Amino acid sequence: RVTSMEKKGYLLLADGQLYEGVLRGAEKASSGEAVFLTSVVGYMDTLTDPAYAGQIVVQTFPQIGNYGVVPEADLAVKPSLAGYVCRELCDKPSNFRCGGTLEDYLTQQGIPCLTGVDTRAITRRLRDKGVMNAAILTEKPADIAAAAAELAAMTIDAETETGVEDIVPAEKPGKYNVVMWDMGAKADTVQQLEKRGCAVTLVPANVTAEAVAALSPDGVAISH
């Protein structure tokens, strides 16, 4: 039940199913491909994983945000998912590394979060019908069928840019000069290369092979 102090929000699936809940995080509408995640831990990994770029992620675990925001757990500099859906968002996290609440983080990153919905029912629907386009809305559509049809016809850009915009020189020196085309590189991938003696230079996805060759790399990598 949405109280007078809370703002209503909605999740509309492309098949016309509408879920009403509480809008937290960034108070804005957003659309993307709806997917579900059944993991019990590691929500910071999920939020910052470039693999979820442009998607609305539904978490089945009932309470998210128990240990707050832990910057060390980030897989990328900033999250790139379109929206977040969970049953309950923890307001009082407890962790010695906690750097703030998850809601504050979502607000700062411009990510809308819908809570107070039956995420397992949503998951069953996505499991049975397959992933589909969806939207987190700030207002209930006047014509749900028309809004769903428009959503179903929408083309979600699978090439969402999640990497660096300019060439980023290696932060740490190394024996080997590795140049990585950044199409959404995970921080851990770079760190693992650095541990193995590599100085990792990141370049945007649209940088030409000639430009990469001009950096005289010992090796070249392409992020997933």
Question: Which residues are covered by each model-predicted region?
Answer:
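Glycine-rich beta-strand-to-loop/alpha-helix junction loops that act as flexible
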Residues: 221-224
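RNA-binding accessory domains that recognize and position tRNA/RNA substrates
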Residues: 4-177, 181-215
